[in-house]
């Protein structure tokens, strides 16, 4: 009896599973500063294995294999699209705060220039690493095999959620009703980013939307 051949998508999902295990162990046993998580740990755990896999297993060009656009004109256009979506996210957050607390305001106090700069850099770094793994690598391959934007985006969003389970349930700042809100928001953000990436054939907008969302969340906890 012949062994069933492992498809390229199954191989990619196997790599994702290994990454999830390594990341879960890291988040459980290593309590290092956030800057180390975002600028060192995630690039090594999330991105490096993907790059090695694309080069050594798929034997493809890295940027095109991740839907990363090198065109500056397209980047500028996609930046403004992302900024618009980010503004909608901010206005939605302000509206939810007003409806709940009857006040207009989202942030306890606005950070100084250095603090804000670090928040922005961290948000961009997070957006790059998480979107490369979840959208550029996993979703792209799911979509290429199924040709169904909705089912592949939904499945990739579930995987994206599992990637956040270690931090969602380990954070002292997120609990109770807020935990549920973050879980739902993660899934919705992932669905939106996935459909945008498939429609535009570019990872730039998802990265920037993810970054804008992270900035709003970070400012909310100050």
Predicted regions and their residues:
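Short, Lys/Arg-rich, polar N-terminal cytosolic tail immediately upstream
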Residues: 1-6, 64
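Juxtamembrane/disordered regions of integral membrane proteins
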Residues: 55-58, 63, 102-103, 166, ...
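Aromatic-anchored segments of alpha-helical transmembrane domains
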Residues: 18-28, 87-96, 157-166, 211-220
């Amino acid at each position: 009896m012949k062994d069933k051949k492992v498809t390229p998508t199954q191989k990619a999902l196997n790599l994702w599973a290994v990454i999830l295990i390594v990341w879960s162990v890291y988040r459980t046993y290593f309590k290092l500063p956030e800057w180390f998580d975002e600028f060192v740990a995630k690039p090594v755990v999330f991105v490096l294995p993907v790059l090695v896999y694309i080069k050594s297993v798929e034997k493809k060009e890295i940027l095109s294999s991740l839907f990363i656009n090198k065109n500056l004109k397209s980047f500028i256009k996609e930046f403004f699209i992302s900024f618009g979506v980010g503004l909608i996210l901010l206005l939605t957050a302000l509206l939810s705060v007003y409806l709940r607390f009857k006040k207009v305001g989202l942030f306890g106090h606005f950070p100084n220039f250095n603090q804000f700069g670090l928040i922005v850099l961290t948000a961009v770094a997070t957006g790059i690493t998480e979107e490369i793994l979840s959208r550029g690598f996993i979703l792209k391959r799911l979509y290429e095999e199924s040709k169904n934007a909705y089912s592949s985006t939904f499945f990739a969003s579930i995987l994206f959620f599992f990637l956040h389970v270690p931090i969602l349930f380990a954070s002292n700042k997120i609990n109770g009703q807020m935990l549920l809100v973050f879980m739902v928001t993660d899934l919705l953000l992932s669905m939106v980013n996935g459909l945008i990436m498939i429609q535009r054939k570019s990872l730039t907008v998802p990265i920037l939307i993810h970054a804008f969302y992270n900035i709003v969340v970070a400012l909310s906890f100050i």
